[in-house]
Amino acid sequence: MHIAEVVTIAKSLPLLRLNTYKSLILSYSADYRRIFKKNILPLIDNKIGKLLLRMPIVNDKIKADMRKKAMDVFGGNFDEIIIGGAPFNADVERFLKQIGFPYTIAYGMTECGPIICSSRWETLKLASCGKATTRMEVKIDSPDPQHVAGEIICRGSNLMLGYYKNAEATSQIIDVNGWLHTGDLATMDADGYVTVRGRSKNMLLTSSGQNIYPEEIESKLNNMPYVSESLIVLQHDKLVALIYPDFDDAFAHGLQQTDIEKAMEANRNELNLLLPAYCQITKVKIHFEEFEKTAKKSIKRFMYQEAKG
């Protein structure tokens, strides 16, 4: 792809990056989920948006109008939005795909410089993070990679030589054959498209033997009304949703604490309609402070596995 002679770059540590090859490259350190929730979800939550989700074949002019509104949220003049760092809401993704919004989802690690999987928006498959990038080889460590999730392993020229002066840590992540073990679970279809399910260390195993990937449930819950962030934990073999509400939004709409509690319970009921029987959420617990985060802004899950109350 041609890149213009004059390109302006505004750089920060990205969770969402806008590539504007025409004139501008931007990267955002802000949580992209909030951007989409505040500005894109309202486009879906109306008659036209709901029609698009039900009927893929609609008037091109309607699609173009919806696409322009969505693109204007990000300034309008860009070639592609690259999303990464957290699961993407399925309804939002399907809507963006149907209106031809130029987004793609990438997967990577700092240790791989950092992209492992990515595809141009025109070819990206729904729910996937694309295919192995150039000079990278990607496999799923599973007896049936298309249907049974396994660990993503990769190797190639993008891979680091190792952690500086830490051979022990290097040997724990890169095996003797040069494969880096990411710790992420995924499936891969026959065309090589990778769909991430979650972190292996985060997977929940019920007494009935069901594997539950909490990130998949959280991505749905985080896009529901007045939810800022959430965690799904297993307590006494039952799934519990820990929710930090968007108090500013709730109070702006005149909600009191009892109203927020009712809204969270309504979210639980709606969420359960979207989930299989073995993933049903039995209880919601409200947190009044943000969850503790790592330096990479990931929630410190280990601190909340024993849900109180």
Please give the residue ranges for each predicted region.
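AMP-binding/adenylate-forming catalytic core of the ANL superfamily
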Residues: G156, L161-G162, L185-A277, E290
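Short Gly/Pro-enriched turn/cap motifs at secondary-structure boundaries
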Residues: A127-A132, N177
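Conserved ATP-binding/catalytic segment of the ANL
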Residues: K68, K139, Q146-H147, E151-T206
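Residue-level signal for inorganic ion chemistry
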Residues: Y21, G85, V138, G192, ...
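Gly/Ser/Thr-rich phosphate-binding loop
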Residues: L13, R17, Y21, S29-L124, ...
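Flexible lysine-rich "adenylation lid" loop at the C-terminal edge of ANL adenylation domains
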Residues: Y244, I286-K308
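Conserved anion/nucleotide-ligand pocket segment
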Residues: M1-V6
